[in-house]
Amino acid sequence: METFLFTSESVNEGHPDKLCDQISDAVLDACLEQDPDSKVACETCTKTNMVMVFGEITTKATVDYEKIVRDTCRSIGFVSDDVGLDADNCKVLVNIEQQSPDIAQGVHGHLTKRPEEIGAGDQGHMFGYATDETPEFMPLSHVLATKLGARLTEVRKNGTCPWLRPDGKTQVTVEYYNENGAMVPVRVHTVVISTQHDETVTNDQIAADLKEHVIKPVIPEKYLDERTIFHLNPSGRFVIGGPHGDAGLTGRKIIIDTYGGWGAHGGGAFSGKDPTKVDRSGAYIVRQAAKSIVANGLARRCIVQVSYAIGVPEPLSVFVDTYGTGKIPDKEILKIVKENFDFRPGMIAINLDLKRGGSGRFLKTAAYGHFGRDDPDFTWEVVKPLKWEKAAN
């Protein structure tokens, strides 16, 4: 059996780039909660003792940006300088302007266009991917790396590993077998965890605790064997972390947000963007399309691409590839996709209920992945029943 290795990485919510994603989406939530028609393009950057929120926002909502920044930092665990940032005493800078009137008239006609007339907020192309290798219809390498990161945060916050600090990264290499275009995981080859820690803990205890409390509960035993390699805090020291260790920016973890290097990516980030931004809404609808194709048994693995021009409602192109795993020809599947999914941005927003913010709806997406999550707020994960005729043998 010929196999190959494929690797995916993740970072947890205390990583500076992810902190920025979460602040940007917390701002989006606050705007949409009060005004579902808010137009939001919110970027965040951070470095030692400083967070800056900037971008273009047109909204009827009253938003306390500084409070959102401090609350988000605090809930992640950035409560003192020694963990990387002090939520209550850091500098918060805000530079928010209105959406450009040129963009506003072209996309939504200053809010006068009907939903089916709303144009894409920009040009671009987005990809959706799905695979039958996990119950989530997501790549195993990505699922495991993401779950390790989430588990790191869980054992920090519940006190299981009190030496943990917010920042951390994970990486998983899986050995795969290619079964006529479908991906079959064989075993976990390598696990890397680098986590921020306090001064008191030894490297031996870090390794022991990570194996017992993080790796064991996350990675199914059947994938681990005596040859699995573990690199646990391989640098030997990771006390300085968060924005103190590295600068952070919104939109710098787009592969972690999506499919862990599988499929493809059009380059557009998600966080801090309202649904007229097709970087986000377009990527969500093609995930639903790809997942529905696989979940309905049309294919074992699938990628869907959609593309847009600014101000134009209809997509310019839709592409489907099932990597040779389709039960019917790809051109038939493409027809089914076009019949069952409305790719116009205004209709995506309605069909996936993307104008509804508040209660941390988009904030939740900003750490541990936008796809493969079992949560009713992740409306794009709902599988649509697709009608199709099995090819006669």
From Swiss-Prot:
Residues reported to bind K(+): 43
One GO biological process term: S-adenosylmethionine biosynthetic process
UniProt induction comment: Strongly induced by elicitors from Phytophthora megasperma. Transiently activated by salt stress,.
UniProt subcellular location: Cytoplasm
Free-text tissue specificity from the UniProt record: Mostly expressed in roots, and, to a lower extent, in hypocotyls and cotyledons.
HAMAP family according to UniProt: S_AdoMet_synth1 (MF_00086)
Protein name (Swiss-Prot/TrEMBL): S-adenosylmethionine synthase 1
Organism: Catharanthus roseus (Madagascar periwinkle)
Gene: SAMS1
